[in-house]
């Protein structure tokens, strides 16, 4: 989860220093270990960042975690991301939920009818996946990432799941939208065709 945390830290801060350091560390390891790399897993984004390193940039853990969660959940002004915050009952730390496409801005801009924003979100989504595919190890795509699936808010209508925002990015695969992957003019088609290359 270290690299996943570094990637989303970079998205929220636009500072690649920590990510570059993490990639360099991974690349310097012996070839024997095999890693799985992912942008999103089935659980949350936990902020397993190297705060000892970040303190040299005057970044402190608590306020920084708050910023990351607020930016990526869309609470921070001018944020393009749409996620939700999950408070881990064991650690009482706030963690992040959301699909890659929604965290990359596609959900917000599509909802607003902002074509330029959607295009930017698609480029962001594809760039994040290109990074994932270029890293040493085995890239793992989350179900729905290949078509830019957005957050699934239907969990809130189910009393057995409503209190757990981790269902936000663990919804049912949208087979209807998946059909659009053959149409290069759609969000689904643009992402699918880019990842297929």
Give, region by region, the residue ranges found by the protein language model:
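Active-site and adjacent substrate-binding regions of carbohydrate-active enzymes
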Residues: 1-197
């Amino acid at each position: 989860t270290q690299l996943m945390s570094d990637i989303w830290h970079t998205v929220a801060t636009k500072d690649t220093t920590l990510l570059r350091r993490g990639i360099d560390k991974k690349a310097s390891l012996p070839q024997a270990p095999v890693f799985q790399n992912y942008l999103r897993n089935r659980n949350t984004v936990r902020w397993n960042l190297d705060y000892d390193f970040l303190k040299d940039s005057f970044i402190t853990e608590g306020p920084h975690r708050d910023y990351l969660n607020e930016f990526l959940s869309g609470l921070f002004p001018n944020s393009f991301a749409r996620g939700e915050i999950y408070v881990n009952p064991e650690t009482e730390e706030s963690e992040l939920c959301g699909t890659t496409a929604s965290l990359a801005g596609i959900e917000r801009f599509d909802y607003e009818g902002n074509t330029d924003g959607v295009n930017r979100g698609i480029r962001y989504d594809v760039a994040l996946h290109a990074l994932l595919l270029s890293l040493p190890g085995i890239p793992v795509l989350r179900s729905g990432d290949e078509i830019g699936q957005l957050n699934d808010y239907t969990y809130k209508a189910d009393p057995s799941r409503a209190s757990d925002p981790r269902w936000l990015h663990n919804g049912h695969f949208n087979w209807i939208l998946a059909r659009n992957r053959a149409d290069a003019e759609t969000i689904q088609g643009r992402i699918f065709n880019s990842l297929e290359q």
